[in-house]
Amino acid sequence: MTSSTGYKVLAIGEVVFDIYPDEKHIGGAPFNVIYHLSQMGIASRLASRIGDDELGNEFLELSKSKGISLEGIQRDPKKPTGEVQVFLNMQGTPRFEILKDQAFDYIEGSPELTFVEGSFPDFAYFGTLAQRNSTSAKTIQETLGRLKGNSKIFLDINLRPPFYNYETIDTSLQACDILKANEEELLELKRMLGLGYYPGENDLIDHFYKEYNIQSIFITRGKNGADLYKPEKSPLPIKHPTTFSPNIKDTLGAGDAFTSKLIFELIQGKSEEEATKLAINFASKICEVEGALPDEK
């Protein structure tokens, strides 16, 4: 892997605000990952698109205050900054509605993302949500195509129904070197790809290695930690259980925290096994405070 750029990580995808009845929080998995990495001291870039509106201004203000580069941020003169409407039932359980036709659906490639051309960060991170629209999907896949072989391509599958299909999943798996999914997403991948004939998880993982040539697969399991699958050790996973603190306040953003710490430790030269343990511990600590980004304000 060759690094010939001033930054270590590129994340490309959505910026959204979670809009609650009485408050709002900035988010989107790509932004959350870059936020954490920037606070860890890793030079990072986010490629996304926001609206020319109040939420867009809030995003710029927060990013500047946290030292997050705005080099890859585009502003759309017509489409609004991404929003997720959050509805709470009588018990306070949230229901999320991701609004359609948002600025992040229209991320443009060259010349807007010229800083990517000829540069090879250590890691390039992406997911599936921002690929729901053909404009952003084309930009994401073309960008990853330029980086493939020089940067580690990290797919955090982040399935958000109904915003994915067979083509998006298959193309994304073909592009990635590293896959991260949770248990529910793994079952959904099995269904979407028509792999129901595989009786067990290990056989399914083995199929991903052979079909997509993925180098490492991380399956997160909530309070039970995470498993690391490696092709040379397949089909048996390397298990990393964890004991979460009894002081859990909020699990929102735990997956993004895991990913951020995992990438951070891999950049530091840690083995995937050690990086996984440290990532689990970091995610569990994030769950002890409210919000996906504890120091957002």
List where the protein language model places each region.
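Conserved beta-alpha-beta core of the PfkB/ribokinase-like small-molecule kinase fold
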Residues: 123, 128-203, 225-226, 231
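Hydrophobic anchor at the start of a short beta-strand
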Residues: 44, 70, 151-153, 217
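Active-site metal-binding loops of divalent metal-dependent hydrolases
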Residues: 14-15, 129, 157, 257
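Glycine-rich phosphate/adenosyl-contacting loop at the front of the ribokinase-like
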Residues: 1-69, 73
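Conserved phosphate-binding/catalytic region of the ribokinase-like
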Residues: 1-7, 198-297
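Structural alpha-helical scaffold elements that stabilize or flank donor/cofactor-binding regions
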Residues: 116-117, 171-172, 210
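Conserved N-terminal subdomain of the carbohydrate kinase-like
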Residues: 43-128
